[in-house]
């Protein structure tokens, strides 16, 4: 009997941990030319937001995003589900609703059977169906490593559009999914994942960030982004710095997956963790190793980071509870201080 195929053994990276580090990305983009100004482009790349938004008319905009990566789990169907969930998340993070998706597939056709790729596509299609959108087509190439993701198109009302650089002082910070996805998936890749922890990270990664669409309609939500490959600290730096503020982050209040401490002790630290710290560490107060390893852990299909004004908190928490989310604040935004993020 042949051994089951372990997709993670065919890639050098995993999930959003494959991202080029922000430090290197800055070099790539610095001399690549400037974008011509277009007043209809409501959101471009200036603030490294989750998606681009282009005006359809004075009230509505089309939301466009793409996201793809190498396998973060061994099962091909789950890989497809996770990649699709992660890609669609960007639409929700802007406060929008997805309309359709196009698949992006790279496959080592001389190494892995096409039937395995078929399972990846099947997983992606299942998530699109769950989100209520068609997987309308796609493009594929012969590639040295498996790659899958989506280009997703959505729509958003201008008054409900949420950006990552529009928070205000006094906003409370909320996170809708626990951290530690990169740590547990690294444990799986190293064959160190305990039986009782199997499926924990997968289930979170396959949970759509649909609450973002509802949060977008709340005036008390001042800024929103999803936490992915740059870790909570990286995305929080971008939110705080972009808004001209400092975030006070309560480390003890940050939700995390069970057994994170066990796997950190086993050395299950993704390579992206240290790349994230190298890119953002100078903008953050001093951290212990444990804080660094959790807060810089690259998330794949992570949760929504939401900045909520005090006057809107009650309504926000009521909507969150209605959607099955039991949330507590993990920090607060204050007037700008010496660091973009102070961990307390």
From Swiss-Prot:
Belongs to the selenophosphate synthase 1 family. Class I subfamily. Its cofactor is Mg(2+). This is Selenide, water dikinase. The keyword Hydrolase does not apply. It comes from the Bacteria. GO terms for cellular component: cytoplasm. It is an enzyme of class 2 (transferase). It comes from Pseudomonas putida (strain ATCC 47054 / DSM 6125 / CFBP 8728 / NCIMB 11950 / KT2440). HAMAP family: SelD. One of its GO terms (molecular function) is magnesium ion binding. GO terms for biological process: selenocysteine biosynthetic process.
